[in-house]
């Protein structure tokens, strides 16, 4: 049944480039791409969730939402301080069935509260925004299967995505940065990628 969503099977960098809505069998034939799969078209919030799992048990969660920029890319991500209890319950049930002995970080991409991707890795764009000591705790989790990090003062943070040619030297307009900081003073930590 159409519409469906077509996307690359392998998506090593977590970018949705190349994905598209396919509205009919004719549309499918016109846009058939080698290396793509199709899935039910989901609607709702697109959430990226990192979870620290110790022997299959969730010990820590963090959720981020992206602002779409078109072409399967995002303009920026908001790393939320708040929890998403319903999504966490859904993901915890899935992990109990599929990852009951796993210790490490798992990243989920969901749309409308349904899993579209699951990765045995973290979102690599913003672990430094999770707080002091988080990276060391992740290393300990992989090394010994234990999660000991205690989060203090969780804050909303932002990661701005920069797409551009590799090898080009980019400059930042310090005045624009200061104006943006003044506009969003007190909203959280800002981070550029």
Label each PLM-derived region with a short phrase.
Residues 37-38, 93-101, 145-150:
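Short helix-to-loop capping/linker segments positioned immediately adjacent to catalytic or ligand/cofactor-binding
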Residues 126-144:
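Gly/Ser/Thr-rich active-site loops/lids in small-molecule metabolic enzymes
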